[in-house]
Amino acid sequence: MRMSRRETMQFSATALAGLSLASLEAEPLAAQGAPQPDGLVETKLRQISTLPLNPDGSAVEYTPQEAGAITGVLWRTKNKTPEGEYDVRKMKIKVDGRGTATLSGTLTFDVLEKLPRHSYVVRLQCGAPNPRGTVKWTGVRFSDFAQAVGAQSFANYCRLVGSDAYFIDEDMTTLMHPQVVLAWQLNDAPIPPEHGAPLRLIVPFRYGARSLKAITEIQFTATSFAPPKPWPT
């Protein structure tokens, strides 16, 4: 993987921004529901786990022999795996180009199956100690998918929504990195439901909250997205 100095600086900046924000987006702010202080007060810092990265901000890659299991599971539906279609060959994912891609509609596996397949052994690490694990992901690069649906240069951002209504908004510079994949295999087997079947976004140089599980919708935009829906209760 080779990147120009300019690309490296741009990517490293966006990666670090995502690392610092991941813990905030992964759970409601601790201050919500508490009385609002009249001024700024000292608060306790969260202990964040270490995420192994290369000097250029990309994820450290491991050998196939180092692949193992993921310990721990996290869902927004009271930590219960949402019901849904877990078979990647039967999946139907909504794609909305919002005027920034030439194709919109329903993404099915036959579209992904025609794209080059890639595998990476990388660390999945939550901001907390768990979930975590060094595992092998197999799928297609997000950049190849974006090209397949005709995402234009002015498609600056992407929103991905999971089956538990959790979502991430990500800049396209990050998603076009060659390590970012739409994966349907974990350690050479279909991703199990608890870890994000049928299709999961893998952003290995960000904390695990950014690797969205069980994708149900993908949107592109040039500017901004509508306000999110409330979390399921």
Sequence positions of predicted segments:
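Basic (Lys/Arg-enriched) interaction patch that binds polyanionic ligands
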Residues: L24
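N-terminal secretory signal peptides and thylakoid transit peptides that target proteins
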Residues: M1-L19
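Structured, non-membrane catalytic/scaffold regions adjacent to prosthetic-group chemistry
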Residues: L29-T233
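Cleavable N-terminal signal peptides
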Residues: G18, P28-L29
